[in-house]
Amino acid sequence: METNPFTLGFGKTPHTFISRTSEIQNVIEDFNSDLPASQSYLITGVRGSGKTVTMTAIANSLKEEGEWIIINLNPNRPLLETLVAKLYDQPDLQPLFIKAKFNLSLFGLGASFEKVAPVSDIEVALEKMLNQVKEIGKKVLVTIDEVTKSENIKIFTSSFQLLIREDLPIFLLMTGLYENIHELQNDSTLTFLYRASRINLEPLDMVSIKNRYKEIFKIPASKAKRMAELTNGYSFAFQTLGYLCWKNREFLEDETALLPAYDDYLQSYVYQKLWTELSPQDRKVLSILSDEKLTKVKELREQLGFSSSMMSVYRDRLKRKG
């Protein structure tokens, strides 16, 4: 039996996915320009919208060009120390650092050199290393997935700002849920991030979803269109629906049997997590919004006790949360 081209795993690039070509190309072109508009991009969206896949696609494309060194960092580890260690381990760079007699022994890297004082500050070490990278005409892209407002991130982004002010070839891609990115950008100590370019991942193009289903399942355009409508442009729903129909081809002919299984998977993988992350007030608002008897905005506002402006704020917040 052929391998299922769809996947339910988060973070890993699926065998089949709909690339966000425009967003990806814009970042690549900016990073490759002589005077980039931004050396940092924040990719945000609801859970399962394809943030990690988009970031990975950008990193892989740049890596293929040969001028880029890609460093993936874990947001829960000391970021500056890990970046220095990973740069030192790069086969193309380590000989340069040794030749330049960088004494990084205090960080557990390489050997100490006679009459060469060890570098004692991690930012100084990173600056020296990036200057070597600059001399050979290369650039460093740092990727960090699923960031939150943590001390690790605050320290790293503050240092990153200093490095780009020194005109060093370091670039940054970070992904995160809307509320986490919003919290980071509004931290008074991280004004640099407030000015960082942000990519908000919108729903996938419905025509692209339809065409992909039509191609993979060899089904009529009308049936593929109906499947696309069931996803509502949600990236994880595109994968889930495709996964189920590949696993059980009878679902392609029997929507009545498909829908309960489809809802169960979305509930287990996404909806339960989204619900637990909502505040009690958010849950109350959603419960009232789901009341089919309340069809007019005015009726909803009165039931919630919201002003027009408050209603708009909540609607926008909940939409961004998924």
Name each model feature, range by range.
Residues L304-K321:
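Short amphipathic alpha-helical interaction segments
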